[in-house]
Amino acid sequence: MARKAIIEKWSKTPKYKTRAYTRCRICGRPHAVLRKYGVCRICFRELAYKGEIPGCRKASW
């Protein structure tokens, strides 16, 4: 319940720009968010595994 309230609060534009911070678009996680994709590392990994992120594949060497 608290996370939903935070996501709702985050969706509005803040009074001051410095108060804005990145959150995952899918789960709302505030840490480890990849700015280029707008998702956290966990959701990014799931999306990459499913093949939903074009041009991204697992590294292997």
UniProtKB/Swiss-Prot annotation:
One of its GO terms (cellular component) is cytoplasm. Gene3D superfamilies: 30s Ribosomal Protein S14, Chain N. The keyword Ribonucleoprotein applies. Binds 1 zinc ion per subunit. Keywords: Metal-binding, Ribonucleoprotein, Ribosomal protein, RNA-binding, rRNA-binding, Zinc. Zn(2+) binds at residues 24, 27, 40, 43. Its cofactor is Zn(2+). GO terms for biological process: translation. It comes from the Bacteria. It holds the Pfam family Ribosomal_S14. GO terms for molecular function: rRNA binding; structural constituent of ribosome; zinc ion binding. Belongs to the universal ribosomal protein uS14 family. Zinc-binding uS14 subfamily. HAMAP family: Ribosomal_uS14_2_B. NCBIfam families: PRK08061.1. Part of the 30S ribosomal subunit. Contacts proteins S3 and S10. Binds 16S rRNA, required for the assembly of 30S particles and may also be responsible for determining the conformation of the 16S rRNA at the A site. This is Small ribosomal subunit protein uS14.
